[in-house]
């Protein structure tokens, strides 16, 4: 079975640093090598960036993070997640333009000029030995200005279909890595950077040994939640007799928890509801079946754990890249894929009732065969090679 969601850690307080400024500052040794990590927007960009940032710090690097600040009402995810982990947080004013109206596009040249200038200020102040771009629109102005200022640029593309920013930056980057094969010309296929917890879980056969009773179901909608899954899953579970119903943990996304709670109450179904999952690796390992979207990080994490997944790709994903992500595992027997338009409460209820744990073990085993677990180490090695 197959999915999307990228998990998230609970959001600590957002930083209040001004645009072009630095929020949290690390205490590091004088003369340490310096990396500037550019990533933002969603967990799919941020969590791989954190994996690399933490590994670099463990090797004595001083790491700064460049992202967007968001607004007072809706701070960016990176401004919430990065500073509490001890990294200096820099911000510039730039966000996505794809699908925006004509007014936003009309002001794009001015916004770009401002973002270019802010990026120059950040790069000059931080003085990085290496700049790493892990996606998000924020990477475009900062990546271009880094190269203009003579800095080495390392890129990583998480998805099976390259994003617009990386398509542009690949021509000026020193090293390019991808999570899936054949995504960018002359790139090295290494998989997605992972936090160590995902590679330390017992294998599927060991985890499933001795499990009996109702299935343990985990529903994750990614770092931003998934309204369609929040609406559909409670209705499907209500169609299953209570004595045969799975034991459910459902991650809602920060802004959708109350709506999800109302959906389960209306369906008369009990479930553990949470806006975020702090330890996603353990949650994947504990579940018999994960219902999720098919963001690149989620697919990578599913493979690393060897979890069984039902992927429901986000239908509005750019270039339908979530379907392509999911097929990387599903085509090898490492999960199941159902498009959102084809998934009804009745169909999901039927699938859950007929699913056997033995089949889920096989999904997990096949998914695990597709894992690549050295992406973080290879990106760190590239940075150290460049910085010599």
Which stretches of residues belong to each language-model region?
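An amphipathic, basic-hydrophobic alpha-helix
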Residues: 97-130, 148
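Acidic donor-binding loop of glycosyltransferase active sites
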Residues: 129-130, 285-300, 307-308
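A short, well-ordered alpha-helix in the C-terminal region of glycosyltransferases
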Residues: 359-373
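C-terminal alpha-helical cap of glycosyltransferases
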Residues: 373-388
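Conserved nucleotide-sugar phosphate-binding/catalytic loop shared by glycosyltransferases and other
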Residues: 32-40, 57-111, 254-256, 341
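N-terminal subdomain of nucleotide-sugar transferases
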Residues: 2-16, 21-70
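Donor-nucleotide binding loops and adjacent catalytic segments primarily
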Residues: 66-80, 85, 203-204, 208-290, ...
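Active-site-proximal region of nucleotide-activated glycan assembly enzymes
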Residues: 62, 88, 147-205
């Amino acid at each position: 079975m197959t999915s999307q969601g990228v998990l998230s850690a609970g959001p600590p307080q957002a930083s209040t640093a001004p645009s072009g400024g630095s929020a949290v500052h690390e205490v590091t040794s004088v003369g340490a090598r310096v990396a500037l990590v550019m990533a933002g927007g969603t967990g799919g960009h941020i969590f791989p960036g954190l994996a690399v940032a933490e590994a670099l710090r463990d090797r004595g690097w001083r790491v700064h993070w460049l992202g967007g600040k968001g607004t007072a009402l809706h701070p960016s995810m990176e401004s919430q997640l990065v500073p509490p982990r001890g990294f200096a947080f820099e911000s510039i004013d730039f966000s996505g333009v794809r699908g925006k109206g004509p007014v936003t596009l009309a002001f794009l040249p001015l916004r770009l000029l401002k973002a270019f200038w802010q990026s120059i200020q950040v790069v000059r102040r931080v003085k990085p030995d290496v700049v790493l771009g892990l996606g998000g629109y924020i990477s475009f102005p900062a990546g271009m200005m880094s190269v203009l200022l003579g800095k080495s640029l390392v890129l990583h593309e998480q998805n099976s279909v390259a994003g617009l920013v990386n398509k542009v930056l690949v021509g000026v980057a020193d090293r390019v890595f991808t999570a899936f094969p054949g995504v960018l010309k002359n790139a090295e296929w290494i998989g997605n950077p992972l936090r160590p917890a995902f590679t330390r879980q017992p294998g599927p056969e060991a985890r499933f040994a001795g499990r009996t009773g109702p299935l343990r179901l985990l529903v994750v909608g990614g770092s931003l939640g998934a309204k369609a899954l929040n609406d559909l899953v409670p209705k499907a579970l209500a169609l299953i007799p209570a004595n045969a119903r799975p034991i459910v943990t459902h991650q809602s996304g920060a802004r959708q928890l109350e709506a999800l709670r109302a959906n389960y109450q209306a369906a008369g179904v009990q479930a553990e509801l949470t806006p975020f999952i702090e330890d996603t690796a353990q949650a994947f390992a504990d579940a018999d079946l994960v219902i999720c979207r098919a963001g690149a990080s989620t697919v990578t994490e599913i493979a690393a754990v060897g979890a069984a997944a039902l992927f429901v790709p986000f239908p509005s994903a750019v270039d339908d890249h979530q379907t392509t992500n999911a097929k990387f595992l599903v085509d090898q027997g490492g999960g199941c894929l159902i498009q959102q338009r084809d998934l009804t409460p009745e169909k999901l209820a039927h699938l859950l009732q007929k699913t056997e744990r033995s089949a889920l073990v096989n999904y997990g085993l096949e998914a695990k065969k597709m894992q690549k677990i050295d992406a973080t180490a290879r990106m760190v090695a590239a940075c150290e090679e460049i910085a010599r």
